[in-house]
Amino acid sequence: MFFIFAFNLWQGYLVFLFYKYKQKPAVVLPKILPQNLPVVTLQLPIYNEMYVVARLLNQVTLLNYPKNKLEIQLLDDSTDQTTEIAAKIIAEMRLKGIDVQHIRRTERTGYKAGALAEGLGASKGEFLAIFDADFLPQPDFLLEMLPMFYENEKIGLVQSRWGHINEADGWLTRLQAFFLNAHFTIEHLSRKQGGGFINFNGSGGIWRKTCIIDAGGWSADTLTEDLDLSYRAQLKGWAFGYMPQVTSPAELPANINALKSQQHRWNKGAAECVRKNLLNVLKNKQIGYKTKLHAIFHLGNSSIFLCITVGAICSLPLFVLSQKFVFLHVFFRLGSFFLCGFFLLIIFFWTSYEAKPKNFLRFFCRFVGFVSVSMGLSLYNSIAVLEGYLGIKTPFVRTPKFSQNKDINPSENLYLSQKFPVFSLLEFAFALYFALGIWLSFYFKDYSLLIFYVLLCGGFGVVSLKSVFQFLNKSAT
């Protein structure tokens, strides 16, 4: 409970930093003369992406950059027809004079990190731009991003803001966009301006090659190779840039089981980075206390799910006992005070809410939905966090992509798991467990945790049933 309260306080501090630096005039970056443009390698790591690889390759042909200074690497670890689809398009690209390399590996060693390392060794560029398969690099991306590197030779990375090409698909994609917009609007900017480390988000960014090499290169010992390299580079003294005015549109998971796969990787990888990098940050005497505090809450943010899960499970028996033992009743009153930290969370998300004009009722419904579904994912994510802290290794599981092709039925996606989501049965049991909490609140006429139990019951119920129904829908097709 204390960590949840402290985390919410820190989110409030990030809002303060956001408003503090919001009025700071943006630095006007000079354009680079065409003859001075550097050689850039565009890396596209893919693995079994037959639904989106054509869209990706067609999009990168639109990049506004001299052909003699742009190298494209398709880092293709695929084992299905993705490779054949890509090969045909690459042949057409080469006929247009585009320098594109189709790099294949005999073994998928190191997963995405291994593919990026392979490409790094063969790259021609001074800078390396990286995009995942579901992204749509905008034509002027390179021309808009590269000038920041010339502000300071110690800038090792410049990250763009993510956009969402399918936000309007349904409530699940809207809630993801709700969260990601807050991350890219407030967290990145506030950490950067407030003296904290920021991170490469895995896609939509440009690295200086010498920075990657100096930091030790790509490593596959965590599932979030992007976060890991980001911290190692900044510990080496490299600075990172962020350009929120440059948007890199991408596809959001529209399937709950695909989202859970992505969330597992992100949260476990963050916990692995705590094990690997946090102590190095705290021990570094060249780093100030503000940077260290930023790192604690940045790297440790996935632990919020563990705190929610443990607190929620323990709350019900303690709630029953509190009806008999007065000292426990006082504890719950104190716990209710800590929940006031959620008001700071409301302010945090309201600040980043991008609907124009802002409608508080619509915002609040989206906020409640986000909190409830996040609680519903907390058990699944908690296991991921525990695995990360305990050093339990699991494969890098890619997030299934769906494409925006209306001729393709999402339920027919071959990359979705063929196994029944057994874990959803446990999540549904949790929904029933917290439904009991709702009933007990009325039975004891003690409503101190009623809202908490409603959010938990609704979240676990929605997540579990959505997982099962989407699986059954796929099975039926």
Report each predicted region and the residues it spans.
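The conserved acidic donor/metal-binding loop of glycosyltransferases
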Residues: 78, 132-136, 221
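Loop-to-transmembrane boundary segments
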Residues: 52, 284-307, 404-435
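Acidic donor-binding segment of Leloir-type glycosyltransferases
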Residues: 58-103, 108
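Long helical/loop segments within the catalytic core of UDP-sugar-dependent glycosyltransferases
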Residues: 90-127, 139-223, 235, 256-296, ...
